[in-house]
Amino acid sequence: PKSMDDLNSFVTKEIGDVQLLFNNAGVAPAELQSIWDTKPNDWNWAYGVNVMGVVHGIQAFVPSMLAHDKDARVINTCSGNGAFINLPSTPIYTSSKAAVSSITEVLKLQLEQMQSKIKVSILFPGPHTVRTNLFSAERNRPEELARDPNAPEHPISSVEDMVEMMKTLG
């Protein structure tokens, strides 16, 4: 989108050629339900941020990184949930982070085929849940992607709650 293109123009003008692109986007909708009980707005919001945020970063910055032909790196933040394990309690978040993992691998292969100087990495924070605002991301949710008011409340409100839930997985 234009906002990412504008960011690239601003950074290039103020700092110079971009040599490090760090795509770090993540929201976790209130889930803990079966896939068939989830709502389209939950999918649209999470995929819009978690997946398309990474895609938009790549689309806005990689072409200019290729053009200046310098050593550079793209780092995409992922999650072990979706890349290494698939928690059944978070189908939307899990599948969105699996998509980020796949996008990162494809980007790496495409740039290698071009013999580009851009290297691609994936970051998996952890190995445990990192204390972030991921579980309170609803505060930034766009109104047009509002949560279903009839959906059950999210029983996980803190990292400690997540740890307790994980203990039950066996």
Residue ranges and their predicted role:
Residues 58-59:
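A short, exposed helix-loop element centered on a Lys and neighboring polar residues
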Residues 75-99, 105, 109-113, 126-129, ...:
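Catalytic loop of short-chain dehydrogenase/reductase
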Residues 32-35, 39-45:
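Substrate-binding pocket helix/loop in short-chain dehydrogenase/reductase
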Residues 25-30:
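Conserved NAD(P)H cofactor-binding loop of Rossmann-fold oxidoreductase domains
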Residues 113-170:
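SDR active-site lid
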